[in-house]
Swiss-Prot record:
CC annotations in GO: chloroplast membrane; TAT protein transport complex
Keyword vocabulary terms for this entry: Chloroplast, Membrane, Plastid, Transmembrane, Transmembrane helix
Family annotation (Pfam families): TatC
Similarity comment: Belongs to the TatC family.
Membrane topology per record: Multi-pass membrane protein
Gene that encodes the chain: ycf43
The species this protein was found in: Guillardia theta (Cryptophyte)
Keyword Plastid on entry: yes
Main location: plastid
Positions of disulphide bridges: none
Name of the featured protein: Uncharacterized tatC-like protein ycf43
Length: 290
């Protein structure tokens, strides 16, 4: 019915309906194929119902699905990047808020242009990443068992939440602390005039570095589920963890000020021991179930 209505509309408005007819046929075939093999619609994936796939997919069908999901992922990514380019001035103003009162200079003719494109690209990737992860899950989950799906879904959701919390922590705590240190350190000697491009490289590296550091509990849970490292072992090596957190904090922090490194190292320690505690809880629940 929807297919016939599409053709009727195209005839009414005298469009080139032959091309649309071909596209509609292909689209209808894809929907039929998807519902035949996955038992549900695109928006509510079959995999969330935890049922077994009744029909095995051939290699050609797998490749077709990969192509479709890659196409939609790339389309959403491109759309988000273009949208961020359109509203890049608003994004730039938001990233400039932690450095209120600082004057930015452009040392090259195209510095602002290329820096704004870079900011828009990172922002577009960040915004489109949930959809891309969703498409990957729709492709991977049907081939997994019920227990594997129950394990993977909370980990993926938790990872995305922690990544967002890392960005928030970096923007509201780490970035202001680091900038205040640099501003006050030489305020009585020099007047701060910062390079526009170097400032945004500093901000982006610090934000994404903090977001990656927040993935530590997810990594610990994966190691615990795979029984590579137990929760007790994670707690037993706490001395090495303190040393390693200091090194990681120094590496992920683009600045050399001790305050930012201490803050990041402290949050890494909190995340590590929180992840180790979660691993112990999971191990205890698995023993009770057995």
């Amino acid at each position: 019915m929807l297919f016939n209505l599409t053709v009727l509309v195209m005839k009414t408005f005298k469009f080139h309906y032959k091309f649309i007819l071909l596209f509609s046929n292909k689209f209808r075939f894809y929907l039929y194929y998807y519902m035949k093999t996955r038992s549900n619609s695109v928006l509510i994936p079959y995999t969330l119902n935890f049922k077994q796939v009744e029909a095995e997919m051939s290699l050609a069908e797998h490749l077709e699905e990969i192509r479709q999901r890659a196409f939609w992922s790339f389309s959403v990514l491109t759309t988000m990047i273009i949208s961020c380019i359109i509203f890049v001035k608003n994004i730039v103003k938001t990233l400039q808020e932690p450095a209120a009162g600082i004057k930015f200079l452009q040392f090259a003719p195209g510095e602002y242009f290329f820096a704004s494109i870079k900011v828009a690209a990172y922002s577009g990737i960040l915004i489109s990443s949930p959809f891309i992860v969703y498409q990957i899950l729709l492709f991977v989950l049907p081939g997994m068992t019920k227990d594997e799906r129950k394990t993977l879904l909370p980990i993926i959701i938790g990872s995305m939440i922690l990544f967002l919390l890392g960005l928030i922590f970096g923007y509201y705590i780490l970035v202001p602390a680091s900038l205040n240190f640099f501003i006050k350190y030489g305020s009585d000697v020099v007047e701060p005039f910062w390079s526009f491009e170097q400032y945004f490289e500093f901000i982006l590296v610090l934000l994404f570095g903090t977001a990656l550091a927040f993935q530590l509990p997810v990594l610990q849970l994966v190691l615990g589920f795979l029984r590579i490292v137990s929760g007790k072992t994670m707690f037993s090596i706490w001395r090495y963890v303190i040393l390693l957190s200091t090194v990681v904090g120094a590496v992920l922090t683009p600045s050399v000020d001790p305050l930012t490194q201490i803050l990041l190292s402290s949050i890494i320690l909190i995340l590590y021991f929180g992840g180790a505690s979660l691993v112990l809880v999971v191990e205890g629940s698995q023993k009770n179930n057995n």
